[in-house]
Regions:
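Glycoside hydrolase catalytic-domain context in secreted enzymes
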Residues: 1-167
Length: 167
């Protein structure tokens, strides 16, 4: 086992999980994956979670507006700062990988997941994607790339997602 996906609706001890519940589970995953008593290699696994508008599976985490609302701000620096806050709140729970940002270019407002896209303009989506990734992972230019308060970002929903016909 090399990785664990914590999808939407998954919690360590039920829906009301605290930060300490998440940290305990992260510690348990780490200890189990590095245990070499059965002859395994002891390589730590990577744990990923959905964090599209904050670390929304954790009670008390900061929840940001959905991407469609953020897209209306026309403020890439705001998107970067949201990524920084999200990364910190995910990192302190022991998770090191997020399934974010969403790269969908919404072309049909009737699409059921239109709220997940930043814009119907590919240039805005591109700009916001870059800003969010810098916020989540850090920036090589500032020596913050993958510092302890950062997480690995994963662009998702990009090839044809958002380009639906009839909603």
């Amino acid at each position: 086992l090399g990785s664990v996906l914590n999808g939407g609706g998954s919690w360590p001890n039920g829906k009301q999980s605290s930060v300490s519940d998440w940290v305990t589970l992260a510690d348990d995953y780490f200890l189990a994956s590095t245990d070499q008593t059965d002859g395994s290699s002891g390589i730590p696994l990577i744990w990923g979670t959905d964090a599209v508008h904050g670390h929304n599976n954790v009670i008390g985490a900061t929840i940001f507006p959905h991407n469609i609302g953020l897209g209306a701000t026309r403020d890439p620096d705001l998107i970067r700062r949201i990524g920084e806050i999200t990364a910190l709140e995910v990192a302190v729970t022991g998770i090191d990988w997020v399934f974010s940002p969403v790269a969908a270019v919404v072309r049909n407002d009737r699409w059921g997941r239109a709220y997940e896209g930043f814009s119907e303009d590919p240039q805005i989506v591109r700009s916001y994607m870059a800003s969010m990734v810098r916020g989540l992972q850090g920036d090589k230019a500032t020596d913050s790339l993958f510092s302890p308060s950062k997480v690995v970002a994963t662009a998702k929903h990009f090839i044809g997602d958002g380009g639906t016909t009839d909603g």
